[in-house]
From Swiss-Prot:
Binds 1 Mg(2+) ion per subunit. Binds 1 zinc ion per subunit. Its cofactor is Mg(2+); Zn(2+). The keyword tRNA processing does not apply. Mg(2+) binds at D84, D86, D88. Zn(2+) binds at C85, C102, C109. This is Phosphoribosyl-AMP cyclohydrolase. Homodimer. It comes from Burkholderia cenocepacia (strain ATCC BAA-245 / DSM 16553 / LMG 16656 / NCTC 13227 / J2315 / CF5610). GO terms for molecular function: magnesium ion binding; phosphoribosyl-AMP cyclohydrolase activity; zinc ion binding. InterPro entries: PRA-CH, PRib_AMP_CycHydrolase_dom, PRib_AMP_CycHydrolase_sf. The gene is hisI. SUPFAM superfamilies: HisI-like. Catalyzes the hydrolysis of the adenine ring of phosphoribosyl-AMP. One of its GO terms (cellular component) is cytoplasm.
Amino acid sequence: MNTETKSLPAWLDKVRWDDNGLVPVIAQEASTNDVLMFAWMNREALAKTVETRRAVYYSRSRKRLWFKGEESGHVQHLHEVRLDCDEDVVLLKVEQVSGIACHTGRHSCFFQKFEGNVDSGDWVAVEPVLKDPEHIYK
């Protein structure tokens, strides 16, 4: 199905889209269950993700579709799509090409861990940079 020339499929109507026509998406690595990143999708992005078997997100700042890895080469191959119990969050189980999901060059965007207590805690980077972002985005 080409989503540019045909109407979008009816199964998309089950998703509870927000007032802007978006739904939050969590990308999880299929082989390890690591949470890789959080992003947004509109109907077209979700349809293209299923159609191409590659993660396609919607950039709220650029107001356009964002094909994961279009600049970095760090694409996400789709294994499975799930919808949560309230039907307002999508989970993508993916294979992360090159092991880098984050624009900081790390495996996961969730690399900062809170350590300490409510009075004297701080966020600590607990995942290494796998590749310098300067060399990812040229």
